[in-house]
Amino acid sequence: MMKLKVYADRMSQPSRAVIIFCKVNGIQFDEVLISLAKRQQLSPEFKDINPLGKVPAIVDGRLKLFESHAILIYLSSAFPSVADHWYPNDLSKRAKIHSVLDWHHTNLRRGAAGYVLNSVLGPALGLPLNPKAAAEAEQLLTKSLSTLETFWLKGNAKFLLGSNQPSIADLSLVCELMQLQVLDDKDRLRLLSTHKKVEQWIENTKKATMPHFDETHEILFKVKEGFQKRREMGTLSKPGLQSKI
């Protein structure tokens, strides 16, 4: 049987979630780099796998699948080595996980990714910085963090939905928030420091997926260091996007 192939760029939040999930659960796979900076996601070869030209994507036998949440659900169901807590057999628990994942797409992801892209990361991908779009994304991110703090992280549980073990939703959302690492430290702390439950939940998810979590995020940490050096040298524009709108 052919080994699973994962097409990914580790600078992509959902790509990292899929890679970490495979590593934590002992799923053997070949990782194929699709460089977003080089726009390889738009190549004819990759579009044969995902016509939408986005990472991550997988090929498992004859199956070609894209969209990270669909991939995580498929892997949870297809590989016996995956522990039940990632995507429980209990249908009510599954439905609640789906509710978090659906919320994520139009709330936390739009806010976090939009803010990082438009305030810092855009030029690395050939896109201009957009302060207006960044400010709008920051408003959504702030609202989403408050919703995480007060609704999705219930009681004293370590993970989403009152669970004491992580699900695919925890991994997906935490990988999203890790993208904030490329921000200036003061800016990142300004966004996160008032959300103590969120900060602890991020740490809980990291610990539950070590050492694979840090290993998969190494490229992000290197990019963070590069941005910080450029800030110190004065060659990188500061976000300067304190919420005043």
Swiss-Prot record:
Superkingdom classification of source: Eukaryota
Keyword Nucleus applies: yes
A cellular-component GO term for this protein: cytoplasm
Binding site for glutathione: S12, Q13, Q41, L42, K54, V55, E67, S68
Main location, first listed in the record: nucleus
Chain segments annotated as transmembrane: none
Reactions listed under catalytic activity: RX + glutathione = an S-substituted glutathione + a halide anion + H(+)
Subcellular location: Nucleus; Peroxisome
Domain GST C-terminal: 90-233
Record protein name field: Glutathione S-transferase T1
Family that this chain belongs to: Belongs to the GST superfamily. Theta family.
Record motif Microbody targeting signal, residues: 243-245
This protein's encoding gene: GSTT1
Function (record text): In vitro, possesses glutathione S-transferase activity toward 1-chloro-2,4-dinitrobenzene (CDNB) and p-nitrobenzyl chloride (pNBC), and glutathione peroxidase activity toward cumene hydroperoxide and linoleic acid-13-hydroperoxide. May be involved in the conjugation of reduced glutathione to a wide number of exogenous and endogenous hydrophobic electrophiles and have a detoxification role against certain herbicides.
Organism, scientific name: Arabidopsis thaliana (Mouse-ear cress)
Lineage: Eukaryota, Viridiplantae, Streptophyta, Embryophyta, Tracheophyta
